[in-house]
Amino acid sequence: MRKILLLICSLLVFACSTAPKKTGEIFDLRKRAEAQLVQGNKQANHGNLDNAMLFLDEAVRLAALTDDPGLRIRAGISRSNVLFSLGRSGEAVEGWNESLNEAVHTGDREMAAVCRVHISRGKLLSPGGNVQAQAVRDEVNRDLALIKSDRLYIAFAWMVIGLAERDLGRYAQAEAALRRSLDIHEKDSNFELAAYNWFLIASFRSLSGDYGKARQALESAIAFDRRVENSWGLANDWRAMGDVQKKAGDRESSRAAYTRAAGIFRALDLEEAAADALSRIDA
């Protein structure tokens, strides 16, 4: 709670002035919007969704003040991603479509493609979305050809393709797509997202029954999440490790992994998630 209050106070410092902006201040607004966007995305990657919304609400507000279409689109996409993670899918879809309309209106074909990729991911991860997997895979593959300048969005598109391949039961192709995403994240030192790539690769390997290699992938995810102190990622990695070890028949290692996950969740004040991890021990 104290962290949230401090964050609100820091946002209020930017929000209180209502005087007209001087011409030179527009560049300061852009810098502040970019800073809020970076922090919002980082908070989201660490599972701090409520804090992420505070940063991203401010990023959207500052982007509106600059009237910079590209900045407005990127801030809108990130905010919609968090809304989707919070279960507010209707608002998320509305936000993605607003960003898409902005991109189309300004003639930005690349950012329009980026918006469509996010919309496709939303379809795929919605209830019953697996029936659309082939259509989503084809749509994202077409849009990927239009994304040239932003490596982060290219990596994201490959991840969505991988998820679609997973839903189609093509686990080797799913991992190949995630490897394309992983290669970008590792080269760009984006270790939080590299950890998530390994987490997904582990899930693909587990689904295919290769529990030994799934464990290796989770060990890589844990190493990256430790490197960036992503406690949320670590808790999920260890819970997944418990699942994999249980499927492999190693009950002792499974229990240890679930217990470790629960300890991290509890340290994050996520008692429900901690209870879920412990409940899997004897399930």
Describe each PLM feature range.
Residues 1-14:
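Sec-dependent bacterial lipoprotein signal peptides
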Residues 16-70, 74:
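N-terminal leader/linker segments that initiate helical-solenoid repeat arrays
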Residues 24-27, 64-68, 104-108, 146-150, ...:
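Short coil/turn linkers that connect adjacent helices within long alpha-helical scaffolds
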Residues 36, 43, 55, 62, ...:
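TPR/Sel1-like alpha-solenoid repeat signature
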Residues 52, 92, 132-136, 174, ...:
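Single-residue signature of alpha-solenoid repeat helices
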Residues 95, 99, 130-144:
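Alpha-helical repeat scaffolds
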Residues 251-269:
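TPR/TPR-like (Sel1-like) alpha-helical repeat modules
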